[in-house]
Amino acid sequence: MAVWGPGGRLGLRGCLGARKLLCPRFQSRGPQGVEDGDRPQPSSKTPKVPKIYTKTGDKGFSSTFTGERRSKDDQVFEAVGTTDELSSAIGFAMELIAEKGHPFVEELQKIQCSLQDVGSALATPRSSAREAHLKHATFEAGPILELEQWIDKYSRQLPPLTAFILPSGGKSSSALHFCRAVCRRAERRVVPLVQTGETDANVVKFLNRLSDYLFTLARYTAMKEGNPEKIYKKNDLSDRT
């Protein structure tokens, strides 16, 4: 997961966030029918576009916000990478949800922004953080409280849960259930970092609450779309005889 440092410095590679337009892959290709060979050649005055690849991680190591070099399978990068995966899963779910015209797309986009803040906190291990880094290592409680408000809002409109439900309820609902499962894995990756004091405890609280939100929203989405939820039924082995 990429986290941009002050002044646009790339701290970790992966997602470009707000700076993605600097990457040629995300820029407009210009008028249709114009081939690359027909484009005007850049002059010496054309500003250089920074490359997406740095080659600094080719040996299996990457840098934290604090400048510390760690193996890419370090607990920090496991946690950062899983929260990035979660944000990507939410982005996919948002595309399905937007097609149905659901109004809570903005909530999910806000959550993606909060996950960028989570990544920033995770990528700033407190054991190597200096005073200037501490603002990146803190995750405020505001997003947690907001999730609780959203959960309560949707829960009041849902029928009571009387049985275990399976991930189901249509494409949008199933995508949100998948996001919930990824969120639980992200939480498991973060717990060791909190237990060792490397990361703000609010990060785990946020992910824990987020999984509850995603579960509730999946149920709410199925209800609004009129799709039935599949109920868990224990397999009866006696039926096979």
UniProtKB/Swiss-Prot annotation:
> Which reaction is recorded as catalysed by this protein?
cob(I)alamin-[corrinoid adenosyltransferase] + ATP = apo-[corrinoid adenosyltransferase] + adenosylcob(III)alamin + triphosphate
Q: Which GO terms describe its molecular function?
A: ATP binding; cobalamin binding; corrinoid adenosyltransferase activity; transferase activity, transferring alkyl or aryl (other than methyl) groups
Q: Which InterPro entries match?
A: CblAdoTrfase-like (IPR016030), CblAdoTrfase-like_sf (IPR036451), PduO-typ (IPR029499)
Q: Which residues bind ATP?
A: 54-63, 72, 184-188, 208
Q: Name one Pfam family in it.
A: Cob_adeno_trans
Predominant localisation class: mitochondrion
Modified-residue entries (Phosphoserine), positions: 128
- Which residue ranges does the record annotate as region Disordered? 27-69
The answer to whether the entry has keyword ATP-binding is yes
Q: What biological process terms from GO does the record include?
A: cobalamin metabolic process
Q: Which Gene3D superfamilies match?
A: Cobalamin adenosyltransferase-like
Please explain the role this protein plays, according to its UniProt record. Converts cob(I)alamin to adenosylcobalamin (adenosylcob(III)alamin), a coenzyme for methylmalonyl-CoA mutase, therefore participates in the final step of the vitamin B12 conversion. Generates adenosylcobalamin (AdoCbl) and directly delivers the cofactor to MUT in a transfer that is stimulated by ATP-binding to MMAB and gated by MMAA.
Please give the name of this protein: Corrinoid adenosyltransferase MMAB
Which organism is this protein's natural source? Bos taurus (Bovine)
